[in-house]
């Protein structure tokens, strides 16, 4: 009888571990403050960032979810808020990024996936050490409906 309980416990544990690991990965995503009120949804597009590494390099991953029922074009510039409470903006004309996201779709930066390079930002392009990093922002984000 004890043997059956052990196997039931072991089975339940194997089901719980992957779910726990998945939850930990998702909890690392932080909202990108798009509004003065701190909201991370603008015109039906939700935005998040995550500080992590890729091939040993500190990277800011960006994720956008288009909740609209039509595609949208996003345009923005990268900005980082430092521990010294200063914004570092990349807002020269050549620094502007854009991306078209289909309706009800999520696009996110992923290590080893070069499909959306604009969603992977090198921390060293803004601060010398990741300890100086505080937050990421999609500065001057605009959401344009695509016909």
Where are these regions (language model features)?
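Exposed beta-strand and adjacent loop surfaces of beta-rich binding modules
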Residues: 59, 71-75, 138-140
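Intrinsically disordered, low-complexity Pro/Gly/Ser/Thr-rich segments with frequent PxxP/GP/PP motifs
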Residues: 83-125
